Amino acid sequence: MRGQKLAPGDYHLIVHACLFNDAGRLLIQQRQTTKKGWPGLWDVSAGGSALHGETSAQAAAREGREELGLSLDLSGVRPAFTLHFAAGFDDVYILRQNVQVEDLTLQPEEVAAVRFATLAEVQALLQSGRFVPYPKTLLPLYFETAGF
């Protein structure tokens, strides 16, 4: 349950979906200023916590649907990366999907804005403190894995 301390041997599963278009741009979202973690900062396309009993693919598809109104078919898709942190794991899905920003339905409690960005634009946001503070080598790896 959210906010409860994990029992010994239990881990938290986080998921992220990184959507790239054919032009090599990553769909990024700006977190609402009311969010507890990293308010107002830009982040990758969609992400959040898996619910009890969900697979990471189910959680990533749900987050895409909830936050952006996107239908993501992740059946049979494995995460490109599983990142480890002290309390758990973060499964990262790298996806290629051409979507139009104006066709997205943003979840107002979570997402303030979305746009597509190049790696250089994402790195500039990161360097200026306006992007969730991922390790500086991580986002270039996402672009490279997507083929850009």
Provide a role label for each language-model segment.
Residues 1-16, 22:
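Acidic, metal-coordinating catalytic segment for phosphate/diphosphate chemistry
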Residues 2-3, 39-40, 81-148:
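Nudix hydrolase/Nudix homology domain
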Residues 8, 37, 51-55:
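Residues at secondary-structure transition points
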Residues 14-46:
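A glycine-rich, hydrophobic loop/mini-helix early in the fold
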Residues 18-20, 71, 83:
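Short, conserved, surface-exposed binding loops centered on an aromatic residue
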Residues 28, 45-78:
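The catalytic Nudix box helix
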